[in-house]
Regions:
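Active-site C-terminal subdomain of aminotransferase-like
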Residues: 24-27, 34, 39-96
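Active-site phosphate-binding strand-loop segment of PLP-dependent enzymes
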Residues: 1-30
Length: 96
């Protein structure tokens, strides 16, 4: 789900979505492309501004919107990091 919808600038009902994910044991991936640099004490995004970091399975930060640079990052728990390191083909074969 997107945390902030670019067309209208409206925010997602993340607290309600997180509650549903808990109820049904679902994982939630949040796209923070339009919230990064805007929400939170230091611009860390809408998820952090609501204090939902532990309720979200993965947070995707695209740097091309607010930061105006190339690249992106995925935030999540250690198990997600280990999975991405070991199974993301473009990452596996990099040497940098």
């Amino acid at each position: 789900v997107e945390s902030v919808y670019s067309l209208h600038g409206s925010v997602s009902p993340l607290k309600a979505i997180c509650a549903l994910c808990k109820k049904y044991s679902a994982h939630l991936i949040v796209d923070e492309a339009h919230a990064l640099g805007v929400f939170g004490n230091i611009g860390e995004g809408y998820v952090a501004s609501l204090g939902l970091q532990n309720d979200v399975s993965a947070t995707v930060y695209a740097f091309g919107k607010a930061l105006g640079i190339h690249g992106a990052a995925v935030g999540g728990k250690a198990i997600l990091k280990d999975y991405l390191i070991n199974f993301s083909r473009p990452f596996i074969y990099t040497t940098a």
